[in-house]
């Protein structure tokens, strides 16, 4: 018996472009259906384009709203909505203009944050202080902290520079809160129960079961041999063992002084690849390098758009094509531009569709061949980006990418968002690939070289 789904009268009217019927669909929660219909009419009808624009903004789909804004300008949406869309795609000057038309606290605060992003702390401070006059109570502390930060950047308040150790301390805070090594070591008698708890904590921190068992057994034997009775002394021994284990997993980023040094980034979608590329581009630009980004992940429009936003933020150039383009062709164009126009560093983004293993491996190998057509010694680095929050799963993912290309270094991201900070130990031990960089926060300067000693100190504090 076959059942046919009958469309309601509302749906039939909506499909003919009836605005009230489309609004009724949205009211009924059928937003996807409404969106599909609105897309069909948006290029011809301004009233439906405005409705689609508002729907996108409500759903947080700001990037998708941008083409409508580009076509209709200030004929659609409210100033604050338009500002948020411009901000999302990196059209910062237009975003500022729209926010200033509103002039409320939120808008002025957003203007201040945009100027800060554009590295204009003086303008950021001007608008933050204007926002201060309108600040609601619940935002007062946040704004005060932001103003203090701006004053430090402008040299109006002396600031103590945050060291790598301080950044790692901050980044590993969630792991320390979840695992509490300090509580175990402080004032505890060293007995069998102590070692059982230590092993559990190491497993919880995600150093890997095998590593946790081996480390605990080694410390147990050492405690018997040296007649150690205090937890603090075991802590020092554990630090020594972890530093020894990690010493071969520390490596500097290799960027030769020449035109067209390539850093190829691989990793699963969502690992933080694009953000890592953006932050590194910013840091290299600050050092005076001429940097080019290549949007080689052509399977996701969002990846291309995100990299474009980072290029604007870092003040560097980008080579990109539309979604669905051949990644090899994009990389070819990027390499050609780099050689012809003298770009010193080329940062290449790639797709990370792990569920399609064979096509992914073939695609990465093809990209590498394209790079080597221009320079047989490149890429200088092939960096695997791993999300610390995925813990042990990251190791399984890494093995797939190792099949495709020679990985020369690892970037561990989102250490600040994970209670699995010990995964760095497991990654080092299992993969035996140097960890070149770690992401310890959302700030543009929170991508840091990996320092094994500082990492161990921060983890066990």
Curated annotation (Swiss-Prot):
Q: Which domain of life is it from?
A: Bacteria
Which gene is the coding source of this polypeptide chain? Answer: ftsY
Stretches that traverse the bilayer: none
Q: Which residues bind GTP?
A: 267-274, 349-353, 413-416
According to the UniProt entry, what is the EC number of this protein?
A: 3.6.5.4
Spans of the TPR repeats are: 105-138
Q: Which PANTHER family match?
A: SIGNAL RECOGNITION PARTICLE RECEPTOR SUBUNIT ALPHA (PTHR43134:SF1)
Instruction: Describe the reaction catalysed, as an equation.
Output: GTP + H2O = GDP + phosphate + H(+)
Q: Where is this protein localized, as stated in its record?
A: Cell inner membrane; Cytoplasm
Gene Ontology MF term list: ATP hydrolysis activity; GTP binding; GTPase activity; signal recognition particle binding
Q: What is this protein called?
A: Signal recognition particle receptor FtsY
Which InterPro entries does the record cross-reference, listed alphabetically? AAA+_ATPase, P-loop_NTPase, Signal_recog_particl_SRP54_hlx, SR_rcpt_FtsY, SRP/SRP_N, SRP54_GTPase_dom, SRP54_N_sf, TPR-like_helical_dom_sf
What taxonomic lineage is listed for the species of origin? Bacteria, Pseudomonadati, Aquificota, Aquificia, Aquificales
Q: What does this protein do?
A: Involved in targeting and insertion of nascent membrane proteins into the cytoplasmic membrane. Acts as a receptor for the complex formed by the signal recognition particle (SRP) and the ribosome-nascent chain (RNC).
A Gene Ontology biological process in which this protein takes part is: SRP-dependent cotranslational protein targeting to membrane
Any one GO cellular component localisation term in the record:
plasma membrane
Q: Which UniProt keywords apply?
A: Cell inner membrane, Cell membrane, Cytoplasm, GTP-binding, Hydrolase, Membrane, Nucleotide-binding, Receptor, TPR repeat
Bilayer disposition of the protein: Peripheral membrane protein
Family per similarity comment: Belongs to the GTP-binding SRP family. FtsY subfamily.
Q: Does the keyword field hold Hydrolase?
A: yes
Assembly, per entry: Part of the signal recognition particle protein translocation system, which is composed of SRP and FtsY.
